[in-house]
Amino acid sequence: MLDIHALEKDTLHDIMLQQLYSFNYIWMRFEIFIAMKAPDEYGSEEYYQLHEDFGAYQARRLARVLGTPGEGIGELTRFLKHSHWAAFEDIEVVDLTADSFTMRTLDCSVQRAAKKWGAQHYDCGKGGLRVRTGFFKGINPGAKVQRVFTPPEVGSEGIPANVSCEWLVSIE
């Protein structure tokens, strides 16, 4: 077992970062594999429930480090800053009201990878909605997530071209 207490902090950081990239890579490979080998299951309710379960699980694990979440929209953004999205992507949060914000991914690494592998885009709409729903509801059961746009759509006029997707997050 990795003796994390014997490692220098920078070494441990680098190891964990490489592990994150490895998990992200295999996630993409599994999605492609399932789409090709199990097309009836790919995109099924059970498939998307796994996405939602992952989001909720991530929120629970973060709560072990960050503490039990309090009330309010600020808790959602606090947890978001420590999520896998923040680890892999440039995330922009735009506060709208006391109970809502938009979450934007800038220059999405997954979209870049999809193009590198020959696809026009990665279809993240349904899965992305379910992961975010599980994550934010795992922090606050009153959270609601709505898709504003995801590829192949582009943002409305005035949205910078480097915004890959946008989500509205609120507490009801």
Which residue ranges define each predicted feature?
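Ligand-binding pocket scaffold of soluble enzyme catalytic domains
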Residues: 134
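N-terminal accessory segment detector
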Residues: 1-102, 107-127, 137-172
